[in-house]
Design a protein with these regions (language model features):
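A charged amphipathic helix-loop-strand protein-protein interaction module that recurs
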Residues: 25, 68-101
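Alpha-helix capping and helix-loop boundary segments enriched in small/acidic/polar residues
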Residues: 12, 65-72, 85, 105-110, ...
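Solvent-exposed alpha-helices and their adjacent loops that cap or buttress functional pockets
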Residues: 41-44, 88-91, 107-109, 121, ...
Length: 182
């Protein structure tokens, strides 16, 4: 991300750009809430979206309609993807990471995260991230809240950050694996 000249931006331009980014995050919220089959997301709005800094993963803006509890943790999810991509060395336009590991930028296993790098003119511009509460992700009991569980793996399917899509092509192995546990 090119940051040269950023201190020269005038307050009006800054306000317009900030408002546009907020609108993008709000539209991400509205799109998921309208399209969701899951009533926890569609009705209770147990989800959130935002735009995150391309280098640091820090929160730039977050949608107004999602749950505010995710504001504090979503940047950790994005940072986990940045670290994973740096380790693997293969971040590309159209990649989408999915995961629910609560120890890596999360809240609990029912909150599934999607993180996508967004490129502008061939350069990484920011990350788009979404989190939403899923009814069931393969735990021993419906809803994943098992008071008899003695470790996290008895609560639900733990998915580390993996590519759901690679350069815009769906990774059907991840979809098939996930369907096998829920």
């Amino acid at each position: 991300m090119n940051t040269s000249g950023m201190s020269d931006i005038d307050p009006i331009t800054l306000s317009v750009l900030s408002g546009r980014m907020e609108q993008i995050a709000d539209e991400m919220d509205a799109t998921l809430f309208r399209a969701a089959f899951n009533p926890i997301i569609a009705e209770a709005h147990d989800a959130s979206h935002g735009l995150y800094h391309a280098i640091s993963g820090d929160t730039l803006v977050q949608g107004k309609s999602g749950l505010p509890i995710f504001v504090g943790v979503m940047s950790f999810a994005v940072k986990a993807v940045i670290e994973k991509a740096a380790k693997d060395g293969d971040l590309a336009d159209g990649d989408i990471y999915i995961f629910n590991d609560a120890h890596i930028g999360g809240t609990h296993l029912s909150d599934m995260r999607l993180v996508r790098p967004y490129y502008r003119d061939g350069e990484l511009f920011c990350y788009l991230a979404s989190v939403g509460h899923w009814h069931d992700v393969g735990g021993a009991v419906p809803g994943n809240y098992n008071p008899a569980a003695t470790d996290v793996f008895q609560e639900a399917f733990v998915l580390p950050p993996v590519k759901l899509a690679r350069a815009g092509v769906m990774n059907t192995d991840i979809v098939d694996r996930s369907e096998g546990v829920v």
